[in-house]
Amino acid sequence: PFAEQPIRYQLAEESFPDLYENSNVCIKVSLERLSWQSKERKLDWKKGAGWIEELVEGLLSTLAKVGKINLDLMDFKTIVEHPGEATILVGSGDTNSLSEIVKTALQSPLSNLEVSGAKGCWIQVEGGPDMTIYHLNSVTEEFVSLLDSDCQVLLGARSSDEMIGRIRVVAVVSGLRTSSNRLIG
């Protein structure tokens, strides 16, 4: 709630240049955005940030676990180095609601960023052993169709037993606006 705490907000803003200079990627999470997300997802405040855990877990497991189509740190670096800001998106649901999964992902950025002009996209689609090429293709095509027509897309896919009947999309989109190219938020 920085609006009520201008000094705290100023200190936070002043710290970002040092963070950018001393890190490869900086993840910025807005309390206002968390509040908005909990309202949009119809969750109480205590549970409203649970999707961040899903987002981080999806990002880390994409990098650490072997998939059918693997994404790695170099792929991640390639995408986040596009000039502009970047954000992480996550959406999940059952295999019968593929459009809803994409819609949920597009409503999940950590900051209020418009992703339609994204120049880079690192997208991981995870499903159970029942996930088909149709599921992978449908989710990916619908998601990517909303980005810049020249967007560089790197696709990963993984199957895991705990995702039976479900699909999860974790994406990093970059090249948004014209600010620091290392901000994910």
Give residue ranges: language-model regions.
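Tubulin/FtsZ superfamily GTPase core signature
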Residues: 1-185
